[in-house]
């Protein structure tokens, strides 16, 4: 998994509240076995004009020229609520989103983000709106910096906003560790425990 230390990119505002995982990627877009190719279905209900063969809706933010290549999403509260489908995170990642800034996330979605190297940043709605306003006022760049090492977000105008993240989740992102890789870092401790437990309770260990 690619480590996340600091990222600077175009931030696109999608400030609707309660954007659920079915809106992020509708179930009809999940007919493939592989996680690859899901970016095409990201926000499919909003990105494409209804009744067309995937003609882009020019009013949807990610289709607007000024947000081409957006890699940071500014969102409303409770982003990623709904079902536990990990496809929502996979689609965002494949599209190029590296961080999402919102007042809150669905709990399972938040964990899925960390497990897949996508940084969920929790900031008050007023701060998210201020970031969106700063981006709108700086049309030449619309660049926001998200620094996981310093735990801060920097607006195009230079305003700095601190955020928090659990220490284990921060370690996973900084070092690019999925849950298995994080567990393997404790391999020596696990082996030591098993060795001691084998001596203490030999009857529960089967070596045959």
Swiss-Prot record:
Pathway: Amino-acid biosynthesis; L-leucine biosynthesis; L-leucine from 3-methyl-2-oxobutanoate: step 2/4. It holds the Pfam family Aconitase_C. It catalyses: (2R,3S)-3-isopropylmalate = (2S)-2-isopropylmalate. Its EC number is 4.2.1.33. It is an enzyme of class 4 (lyase). One of its GO terms (biological process) is L-leucine biosynthetic process. Gene3D superfamilies: Aconitase, domain 4. It comes from the Bacteria. Keywords: Amino-acid biosynthesis, Branched-chain amino acid biosynthesis, Leucine biosynthesis, Lyase. Signal peptide: none annotated. Heterodimer of LeuC and LeuD. Catalyzes the isomerization between 2-isopropylmalate and 3-isopropylmalate, via the formation of 2-isopropylmaleate. HAMAP family: LeuD_type1. NCBIfam families: leuD, PRK01641.1. This is 3-isopropylmalate dehydratase small subunit.
